[in-house]
Amino acid sequence: MIKRISVLLLLLALSMTALFGCSQTKETKHASAIINTDKTNKEENLTPVTLNEVAHSIFYAPMYVAIEKGYFEEEGINLNLVTGFGADKTMTAVISGTADIGFMGSEASIYAYNEGANDYVVNFAQLTQRAGNFLVAREEIPDFHWTDLKDKKVLGGRKGGMPEMVFEYILRQNGIDPSKDLIIDQSIDFGSTAAAFAEGNADFTVEFEPGATNLEKEEKGYVVASLGTDSGYVPYTAFSAKKSYIEKNADVIQGFTDALQKGMDYVQKHTPKEIAEAIAPQFKETNLNTIETIVSRYYEQDTWKDNLIFEKKSFELLQDILESAGELDTRAPYDELVTTTFAEKAAK
């Protein structure tokens, strides 16, 4: 009799367990469905915006802070970030409509305008105020002068691109003729110059990060000068969109700019280490210490503005650089290619 009762109790316990487990599974699935539905509804309430960036670089830290901290979502934007690998490709994406907003050197907007584009691209937010590249030598040169480049070979950048034009601008400012006083090799792709230099090609190379830092860590090169410091304040990279897009989507552009400003504010108020930790998910192939080293280098040279306002004097300096490089026959009007409305509102 006792054995029979025990069996009945065991069967009852198993039934209750199965019933509870089934109920719990249903509740878990129901809770999961609610979470997924909430996430879907949230995404559906956001405005999709495709941003094409010229390159994916720690140089643009405030933008990545805005992404990682969720500032774009706070402003109602579901951001799709695409890397164009070159200002020409980024501009093509914006003009063709495959990207809503472009992030590139502002010289691209001047070129497009002067070529007669009807729905031309307008700059609405300036992120960086200094060049982000560095001159790397094969040996340490504690007391470097730009005249040390005379009769040397340097790995440069693409003709007509901002890295090369800023480099040549500095040379001219120091009495050096880029076409006569040294050899500038422009045959190597942007992303391959550091490797070429490490293999023994040239006496100097002009490098962005992490190329410059990696060469130093490998003891294959040494940073001897900052093009950002020696060229002065230059509107190196800015956000832009077609005139028609800005007119039709003013609220989106304002929200986008507001999100960027939050990123700018974060960078101004936090240490390089904190900034590095914030943007680390964007650079999974780079260790945190290297990211911090690079952020510190940019931080110390005052790379990032405290606002996004693209001032006229900066635009005119940019055109001076284009003219000195022989890339500009006709100056473009600031009032046509730049609007400060959104950045000014974001800064308040």
Language-model-derived ranges and their functions:
Residues 1-9:
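Bacterial N-terminal signal peptides that target proteins for export
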Residues 9-18:
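Bacterial N-terminal signal peptides
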Residues 19-31:
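Bacterial lipoprotein signal-peptidase II cleavage site
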Residues 29-177, 184-187, 196, 203-209, ...:
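Short, glycine-/small- and polar/acidic-enriched structural segments
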Residues 57, 84-88, 103, 157-162, ...:
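Soluble non-cytosolic domains of exported or imported proteins
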Residues 139, 189-283:
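Pocket-lining segment of extracytoplasmic ligand-binding domains
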Residues 247-329:
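Secondary-structure end/capping motifs
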Residues 318-348:
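Conserved C-terminal helix/tail region of periplasmic/extracytoplasmic solute-binding proteins
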